[in-house]
Design a protein with these regions (language model features):
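Flexible hinge/switch segments at interdomain interfaces of large molecular machines
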Residues: 114-120
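Alpha-helical scaffold segments that flank or form the walls of functional sites
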Residues: 98-107, 138, 142-146
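Metal- or metallocofactor-binding catalytic centers and their adjacent structured scaffolds
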Residues: 31-106
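Metal-dependent enolase-superfamily TIM-barrel catalytic cores that perform enediolate-based chemistry
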Residues: 122-123, 127-222
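Ligand-binding pocket scaffold of soluble enzyme catalytic domains
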Residues: 9-10, 22, 32, 37, ...
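Structured beta-strand/loop patches that form or line metal/cofactor-binding pockets in enzymes
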Residues: 1-42
Length: 222
């Protein structure tokens, strides 16, 4: 029986292109030149993901058979007793992706073929249009439409929306405060304004960026 290829090392690479904090995982194997890459990005808690990989998952992973991906995933998920949460899930995901990358290289096949093959030839993508007013958002949307873009995410007030000028009690911590009802009214007016000018052929998307509680999100959708 051939000797299995094992995990020799796990490296965590922190990088920040264009201001986006990314966590890249590189799994190095016992086979010279064979390695895999995965993404473990949790932008707001990248140091926590880095620690989870370096202090917990890396020692657990070294020496394991790279082909036994599901076994690693299951054991990594439960070996710490407490489980789940975005930090651990991102850390495990980065190594999991890297192991699939290795398996694809070993088979000389793209990973999607190992997972059953493609079912479509392409996927729709979107562009992001934001501005301080509905008119400013519409101006950007129209430029994208002229370029042939058909899926556009619209946001008024910049990334995550515009904070509200709410009266704060004495001692309230500094930060941005959001009135969910006002946010809903403001964004829906903007979306309606843009829709009335671009028609039904353009797909409009909106991301509330966790600004709304579930009940407010239901009202927004209705």
């Amino acid at each position: 029986m051939a000797k299995p290829i094992t995990i020799k090392d796990v490296k965590t690479i922190l990088t920040q292109p264009a201001g986006s904090r990314l966590v890249i995982v590189k799994v190095i194997t016992s086979e010279p030149g064979l390695y895999g890459l995965g993404c473990a990005t949790f932008t707001q808690r990248f140091h926590a993901v880095h620690a989870a990989i370096e202090k917990h998952l890396k020692p657990f992973a070294i020496g394991r058979d790279v082909s036994r991906i599901e076994e690693f995933w299951q054991m990594a998920h439960v070996h710490g007793y407490w489980r789940n949460g975005p930090v651990l899930n991102n850390a495990i995901s980065g190594i999991d992706q890297a192991l699939w990358d290795i398996k694809g290289k070993m088979a000389n096949m793209p990973v999607y073929d190992l997972l059953g093959g493609k079912c479509r030839e392409g996927a729709a993508v979107y562009r992001h249009a934001s501005g301080p007013t509905p008119e400013a958002v519409l101006e950007k949307v129209q430029k994208f439409v002229e370029q042939g873009v058909r899926h556009i995410r619209v946001q008024m007030g910049g990334y995550g929306g515009q904070a509200d000028s709410l009266p704060k009690p004495e001692g309230a911590p500094a930060g941005a405060y959001y009135n969910p009802r006002e946010y809903t009214r403001r964004q829906l007016k903007m979306i309606d304004y843009v829709r009335s000018h671009v028609g039904e052929e353009v797909e409009l998307l909106h991301d509330v960026h966790e600004r709304l509680q579930p009940i407010d999100a239901v009202r927004f959708a209705k």
